[in-house]
């Protein structure tokens, strides 16, 4: 039959056999979970002896499980009190009124009387085992709390009361001499204790100790007592002679031993010297603080003097004066060394605050050109001389960096303004407005949505993919050498031109690729407008509605398979073209020649995108159209 615990018995709950039970664990009272003691029935003579032996065995097992210090003269006195249901709160004859520290003057008298009474009672009960066997511990039936006096909670409460009712920290048994702790196991332990250790007497700290530390009423004290509360006296109580408080160190002085202790009240000079020798010398110092400036204040160049004092910065010069006074007149070599160092330091510190800031940014004092160098990317012509095969691309990855498209688009706008606004024609101005409108409505929203989650590493990977794809397209262009080919970025910046394109236009390769040149520089204004319209509609991110566009083209009389085509509408194809897996369109344009004339060409524009569906490269194939006069 399962016995219910005290809580489940009181609340009439179903209790499980485990301890602590589930109900106590749920209510965070697992430490208080114990079996409910039932009323003992009257036993015969045989059962009494068995019960007495069980009580003795339980007492011995309890003492063996925990390492305890027996403070009183006889441990059996405390166990007899517990077995007989002794209530120390009601027995004021045993000196428990001294726990409140209200009668400090009579502590010695109460100690002697209470201890003698406790020892006599323990001897009397131990000499009469029959009486002890007949005693039955009464049950506490208050219904709210069944915890006995000899519990850990009661000991903690008395320890807290001791902290509140006395001036100094409690004296632990670990701080007693060995001779005192050895005498505690004897019958006359309290009588043999020295006066400085007896409760109620004054100790080294000028505080009186508690009587409950020597009376064995309740559970014996454990060797490793814990203090689950914080006291302001813990620092002074746990401080040893060779340890100084943090306030005794000076952290503002400069030098190797900048953690030098200051003389404090109550500490001798020898202790300070020993502790200073024990501190390791710190050779690596933090940034020194000027005497005219607080350590917490920020660096302000305007507040610095035009000529900084060397003695305030360097601690070595202060040490030189001490060496001179101790050793007498310095030698000539020492004077020469000191003069050289002083001249060098004066040369350094005889500068204005602005000169100091300029020297930190640029030693030469002129404007930095780092910003210009960052924008100056490697030209396609020079890059192809360094990277010719895919192996070179991976061996020289330091040449790869994200392309500055912002600067490229800025140059593109300047070029478009130069093309369309040079003659102040209303037609050209309207064409430029249509290009800007097409960019803002068709290209920018989708581009921002695709690139909003990209990081710097993605931009690097995008540029690496572009260069690797460009190598493949160049090798393919060399194999298919029947048509002129030009490859440019999505911003229109030319990256590659084939030999046939150079022969068709009459330009040189270095003339096109050595600097930033756009494909729009080689097209007439009408072809530029058509390019932006077709690129944003079909090539940039794919056709918006491929089926709808094909149906509309068929209705307009545009046939994909070779029928007559209107001149103003391009042919859209979704089949693989020129070895790429991207969409392409057919259209016509006018290509600029080196002599200044435009040549009508049929073009095929193919786009290559990355994994983010962002266009990387556009390849244009140009076939000249010779019309008869």
From Swiss-Prot:
TM region(s), chain numbering: none
Gene Ontology molecular function: DNA-binding transcription factor activity, RNA polymerase II-specific; RNA polymerase II transcription regulatory region sequence-specific DNA binding; zinc ion binding
Domain PAS as annotated: residue spans: 472-542
Keyword terms of this UniProt record: DNA-binding, Metal-binding, Nucleus, Transcription, Transcription regulation, Zinc
GO BP terms in the entry: cellular response to starvation
Polar residues composition-biased segments: 268-299
Superkingdom classification of source: Eukaryota
Biased composition (Low complexity): 47-63
Cited InterPro entries: ERT1_acuK_gluconeogen_tf, PAS, PAS_13, Zn2-C6_fun-type_DNA-bd_sf, Zn2Cys6_DnaBD
SMART domains linked to this entry: GAL4 (SM00066)
Biased composition annotated in UniProt, kind: Basic residues: 361-373
Intracellular or extracellular location(s): Nucleus
Classification via CDD domains: GAL4 (cd00067), PAS (cd00130)
DNA-binding segment(s): 5-33
GO CC terms, sorted: nucleus
Region (Disordered): 34-68, 268-376
PANTHER family for the chain: GLUCOSE STARVATION MODULATOR PROTEIN 1 (PTHR47659:SF8), ZN(II)2CYS6 TRANSCRIPTION FACTOR (EUROFUNG)-RELATED (PTHR47659)
Task of the protein: Transcription factor which regulates nonfermentable carbon utilization.
Family indicated by similarity: Belongs to the ERT1/acuK family.
Identification of the protein by name: Glucose starvation modulator protein 1
Natural source organism: Candida glabrata (strain ATCC 2001 / BCRC 20586 / JCM 3761 / NBRC 0622 / NRRL Y-65 / CBS 138) (Yeast)
